[in-house]
UniProtKB/Swiss-Prot annotation:
This is Enolase. Pathway: Carbohydrate degradation; glycolysis; pyruvate from D-glyceraldehyde 3-phosphate: step 4/5. The keyword Ribosomal protein does not apply. Its EC number is 4.2.1.11. It comes from the Bacteria. Component of the RNA degradosome, a multiprotein complex involved in RNA processing and mRNA degradation. It catalyses: (2R)-2-phosphoglycerate = phosphoenolpyruvate + H2O. InterPro entries: Enolase (IPR000941), Enolase-like_C_sf (IPR036849), Enolase-like_N (IPR029017), Enolase_C (IPR020810), Enolase_CS (IPR020809), Enolase_N (IPR020811).
Amino acid sequence: MSTIRSIHAREILDSRGNPTLEAEVILEDGSFGRAAVPSGASTGTKEAVELRDGDKTRYLGKGVRKAVDNVNTTIAAALKGFEATDQAGLDRRLIDLDGTENKGRLGANALLGVSMAAAHAAAASNKQALWQYLAARTGVTPSLPVPMMNIINGGAHADNNVDFQEFMVLPVGFTSFSEALRAGTEIFHSLKSVLKGHGLSTAVGDEGGFAPDFRSNVEALDTILEAIGKAGYTAGEDVLLGLDVASSEFFENGKYNLVGENKRLTSEQFVDFLADWAAQYPIITIEDGLAENDWAGWKLLTDRIGKKVQLVGDDLFVTNPKIFQEGIDSGTANAILIKVNQIGTLSETLEAIAMADRAGYAAVVSHRSGETEDTTIADIAVATTATQIKTGSLCRSDRVAKYNQLLRIEEALGAGARYAGRDAFVSLKR
């Protein structure tokens, strides 16, 4: 039987040394599922609430004992005997138990841990890998996503003077995920050599990318291009570039305050700034180019470069189907970033991806800066219409774990494995 026998949660540590919640679900047939919840550094104001204890004498107030207790008491009792394969029903039960719009009573971290662990247990009960189990339910032919590899960290993810949060390489000119991963890895090591040659730091940030001090944001792009060439690849053909601007982090009093450029720009000026970069460099994707509340600026950017550049809403949409629908209706952005903990259940995550597909928007499944060894997002990326995955750089085990899971999935798919490559940017084909 695939009904739930027991649910248990515990407090563990994430990749930044902060507590997070891990949940385990055991079914009556003995099947077992485990999942750990990620946590973000730069967060949208409309994200589901991550419940923290606030006790400054313990883990600097970041403990999650309250969320753990909510799982081990309220949620465990309510879901005992529930059919684990009814993911939508299980998640509705969790949402109803919480009873708030933002999941702030029990905590989105409590709900998500149980939601994902239940899916793992249900897959085990069906004797399937999670990606197989999810694909059977989404009706999607599994495929390997293009990795958006964050090889230079800035902003809230690093202690340096770079304003933009992520500078990424996307290895699109390859026929398999494993070859794309190899190219990204070789570029990463080439970048380390280039940075050393320029006398720059090779210390890494939260997501495993290098975090040197540059004289300007554009110097980061130029350095990456040098590394791509040194690794033997061609920018614009083998490899494209991506940015996570995370502009909400430096949007102050109606202006974009670029410390690295010594500039304070209006929305119109910042759109010009980004459009100029997109014209000069092989940039295929820009995430959070404008601040989450600057919808007028977002619309300007979309109208300006949205036919040639993938414009990803992260803080803008926070994986929330209701907010995302506003973007679809207004023609704002052309892609959505999918973060499981922004919305708080697996079903709502899958619905956001399906919404994107119906609207002709691309979906990018993403990690958070505070990660664990959990690889659920890799399975989600393969089993849905998401065509890209963001899971950091090519070092730190919390990031590499997802890449390794994708390698396992590619091997399991065998001759049927398909890598998205240049076809990943579905919103640019409309």
